[in-house]
Amino acid sequence: MEFLSEKFALKSPPSKNSDFYMGAGGPLEHVMETLDNESFYSKASAGKCVQAFGPLPRAEHHVRLERTSPCQDSSVNYGITKVEGQPLHTELNRAMDNCNSLRMSPVKGMQEKGELDELGDKCDSNVSSSKKRRHRTTFTSLQLEELEKVFQKTHYPDVYVREQLALRTELTEARVQVWFQNRRAKWRKRERYGQIQQAKSHFAATYDISVLPRTDSYPQIQNNLWAGNASGGSVVTSCMLPRDTSSCMTPYSHSPRTDSSYTGFSNHQNQFSHVPLNNFFTDSLLTGATNGHAFETKPEFERRSSSIAVLRMKAKEHTANISWAM
């Protein structure tokens, strides 16, 4: 019991009138009975306990936790005291300010982009200025004469010839080589153009002249026809007929009021229908003889009509020969 009394010693000495007073040699049963009694847990007994033990000391730097729901109050205090001027709080504020300052506005972004573009332009200008600019070389007449002499001998001079030529013309070997390259390109272009022109002229000489119609017989036809018209009759001369005409197509003198007549064949040809060739010539070539109108020649039509007549006559001769053979 001495152990209990030492461990649980009262901080304030109880009075003798209290129920918990225990003398130096007093029994412990009275104390245990009072603990088992229900009156010990009543308000009166609680007041006695407060009087016996005294009020608990409250620390000033602690704050009692309030049982509040996080959903009801967003500013929940979990027992951490907020002291103004605390170093941790100031460091957090500074970090947040730095994060906000890192967010660039569009205006600042555009300014920086413009600065980057200017830097890029400066870099490009520096690179272009560092490149060597090529200048055109102006050759004199003496230099061109020397170069042309060598070009007439060979289009591809070797290094030795180029060096000798460079010494004579007071040029560099590289410029001489470039001149020969350009001269060869010009020569190839001229050769190609000359071949094209030569091919065109050859084609024109071969095909174009044969296509043109022959006009050497037109003046003779006109003169003969005008002469026949003046005499009152028209005569189909031999110049109007093809050269390979058969004997049946003899020149025929036509009077204004004569009837149509047929060419003479053998008696066995009567079974075929014949075309009045003389009327064909007179109707197609000699028009308006009775009325006395001026005669107008149609060379193209005359040539076609004569060729058609010749073909028909050849066909009839062929059929006649076949019938004679049978």
Curated annotation (Swiss-Prot):
GO terms for molecular function: DNA-binding transcription activator activity, RNA polymerase II-specific; DNA-binding transcription factor activity, RNA polymerase II-specific; RNA polymerase II transcription regulatory region sequence-specific DNA binding; sequence-specific double-stranded DNA binding. It comes from the Eukaryota. The OAR motif may negatively regulate DNA-binding and therefore transcriptional activity. It is found in the C-terminal transactivation domain that stimulates transcription. It comes from Homo sapiens. Residues 192-326 are annotated as: Transactivation domain. Residues 132-191 bind DNA. Keywords: Acetylation, Activator, Developmental protein, DNA-binding, Homeobox, Nucleus, Phosphoprotein, Repressor, Transcription, Transcription regulation. Sequence-specific DNA-binding transcription factor that binds palindromic sequences within promoters and may activate or repress the transcription of a subset of genes. Most probably regulates the expression of genes involved in the development of mesenchyme-derived craniofacial structures. Early on in development, it plays a role in forebrain mesenchyme survival. May also induce epithelial to mesenchymal transition (EMT) through the expression of SNAI1. Binds DNA as a homodimer; required for transcriptional activation. Interacts (via homeobox domain) with EP300; acetylates ALX1 and stimulates its transcriptional activity. Cartilage and cervix tissue. SUPFAM superfamilies: Homeodomain-like (SSF46689). This is ALX homeobox protein 1. It is found in: Nucleus. The modification Phosphoserine is found at residues 12, 69, 306. Belongs to the paired homeobox family. GO terms for cellular component: chromatin; Golgi apparatus; nuclear body; nucleoplasm; nucleus; transcription regulator complex. Pfam families: Homeodomain, OAR. Acetylated at Lys-131 by EP300; increases interaction with EP300 and stimulates ALX1 transcriptional activity.
